[in-house]
C-alpha cells in the first residue's frame, strides 16, 4: 500500500471533485474515534481554508461533512502529515 502526503491527498480530492470521480475514504469519527469507510462516494464540496470536505452518497444523496485532518486513507493510499 502506497503512502502519500496530506497535500497530495488534497490534490486528489480536488481532482475527484472536478471530474466527479468516486472516492474510497477511511476517516475517524470525531465523537468516538471509530473508523468509518466511505466506499464509492462523490466529493460534493471542498473547503480548503476551513479544512472540511463534504461527501455525497450517489445512491441516496446523503451528505457527510468531515474535517480533512480526520482522513487516514483515500483510494487505498495511507495519509501522512
Model region roles, listed by residue range:
Residues 25, 53-58:
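SH3/SH3-like beta-barrel fold
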Residues 18-29:
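A short, Trp-centered hydrophobic/proline-enriched beta-strand micro-motif
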Residues 1-19:
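Mixed-charge, Lys/Arg-rich low-complexity intrinsically disordered regions
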Residues 34-49:
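Acidic, low-complexity, intrinsically disordered interaction modules
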Residues 30, 44, 52-54, 64:
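Classical nucleotidyltransferase
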Residues 43-46, 65-80:
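Structured surface patches comprising rigid loops and adjacent beta-strands/short helices at the edges
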Amino acid at each position: 500500500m502506497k503512502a502519500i502526503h496530506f497535500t497530495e491527498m488534497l490534490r486528489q480530492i480536488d481532482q475527484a471533485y472536478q471530474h466527479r470521480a468516486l472516492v474510497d475514504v477511511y476517516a475517524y469519527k470525531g465523537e468516538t474515534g471509530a473508523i468509518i469507510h466511505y466506499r464509492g462516494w462523490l466529493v460534493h464540496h471542498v473547503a480548503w481554508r476551513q479544512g472540511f470536505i463534504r461527501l455525497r452518497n450517489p445512491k441516496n444523496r446523503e451528505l457527510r461533512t468531515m474535517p480533512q485532518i480526520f482522513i487516514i486513507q483515500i483510494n487505498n493510499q495511507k495519509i501522512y502529515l
